[in-house]
């Protein structure tokens, strides 16, 4: 990535050989047992597959020279089941049996959501036939209890650590799952996080993911967060693709832009839209079209994404018409 920075932005406004991007979003870079790294085992380190902390610091330095801000994925909805906090809590509960846990003996028990009932979305604690834990995505991603004050202090410390490393902000994963099936509660937690971050660094940029419909994710702007990814325009059935395919009139694009300005602005007058056309969870944009006009359609779709207000995001390779679909690793 460091070697390709001049392709992203060479820092010279007089040249035209770079993309001219002023920000980079890094998907999870922290140690994790998975290929996608959304299940973190250490929030204070760099996964060896990507390099070292020294490499990261060099990246920040070189980006600063070019006027590029770096934001990183911060996954606080859940950790890896291999995280020391979770492993210690599970070991404690397995030894405890049917007795009630003591937070003085093991405070990490309250970092997660444990129960003696196998509730929906819960998996069995290893080594125990009594205890279960919430893991909505899958058993290897135990959900945090984001109401726990000690955990919140840990998250604040993590934010401090990465600000000290020079990051300009964070992308927040799966915010609608902070409290699953409870939009007001998830918004409340997002409000806490946003306020905490802005007190530390007022110019920090925060963008969050809530993969749902526009009427639902617009409500998260009540938290005061800068941006929510604008899913309504993205993917193969989004507004952009449907206009480019001819399934919708071009006027639908402009009308929708006017509508979201009113909708988002009603929740947060200072919002910054975060349009994107495709991402790591979707097929590549170049695969949305077929036939002799597909290259032109791909270019037009990319242009419509960049024409939107706010901070447009471009998934790497989209500027080249890169293809890929199916498994996440192929995207």
Model-derived regions, located:
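Active-site groove signature of glycoside hydrolases
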Residues: 76-78, 140, 156-181, 270-282
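Generic hydrophobic alpha-helical segments
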Residues: 1-8, 155, 159, 260
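Conserved alpha/beta catalytic core and glycan-binding cleft of carbohydrate-active enzymes
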Residues: 82, 87-89, 94-116, 194-195, ...
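Acidic/aromatic-lined carbohydrate-recognition and catalytic surfaces
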Residues: 1-150, 164, 175-223, 231, ...
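Glycine-centered flexibility sites
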Residues: 20, 37, 51, 166-169, ...
